Amino acid sequence: MAFTASLDGAADAGARIFNNPASIRDHSEKLAILEFPQFIPPTRVARAAVDINAFIDAHGDTILKPLDGMGGSQIFRVRADDPNRNVIIETLTHEGRRTIMAQAYLPAISGGDKRVLIIGGQVIPYSLARIPKAGETRGNLAAGGRGVAMPLTEGERAIAEYLAPILWARGLLIVGLDVIGDRLTEINVTSPTCMVEITAQTGFDVPGAVIDALEKACA
């Protein structure tokens, strides 16, 4: 993130930079979803154990994750009767010194944590479902998930088409939404992946769409 500050000078001098450095800084990949509450699962951002425990008590099955993680690192599924729930909260929050996110567990994860790509304000018609391996909650490919490309569902398309013009207006040319069922869980703007897998499995030329979007933006 610090490097984006140095890119501001280049942008001020006329360089076209995608994604826009200021927009990258403004879009915390975990927190950005809070701008679109109509699409997200029940969510709480907190560091105090009492607040996190209250969320777990209210929603039961809960996902806890740090705000700066990636690849499924340090993501915990905690149930209300989990004997380790307090120590998990203490560990993730560094005993109340670090803010984390709590989200209601979505059973639709069994069908995959979907990566939906938006390129230059246009929605790619396929997602990559990252399906958890047996015994896992996390679908991330880095955590052993299996990637299966498939056409967008109506719900996924509705979310993506709503967000696409908003994010493109902010200079975000390449965006990866994470969607479970019909709920938005993250907006990735730093290094959205799954282009290779979608292209290989469907024949849809996602890299070509990126080049086309760049040429159009710079024309």
Question: What is the predicted function of each stretch?
Answer:
Residues M1-R47, D51:
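Conserved N-proximal alpha/beta basic substrate-recognition cap immediately N-terminal to
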Residues P21-A22, L67, Y105-L106, L117, ...:
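Anionic group-transfer/hydrolysis microenvironments
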Residues I17, T62-I63, I174:
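Hydrophobic beta-strand scaffold residues
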Residues P37, L141-R146, S191-T193:
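Short glycine/proline- and charge-enriched loop/turn segments
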Residues A49-V50, D57-D61, D68-I159:
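Phosphate-binding site of ATP-dependent enzymes
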Residues G135, P151-A219:
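ATP-dependent carboxylate activation and anion-phosphoryl transfer catalytic cores
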Residues P21-R25, R130-P132, I180-R183:
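Short glycine-enriched loops at secondary-structure junctions
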Residues A11-D12, D57, W168:
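Anion (oxyanion) recognition and catalysis
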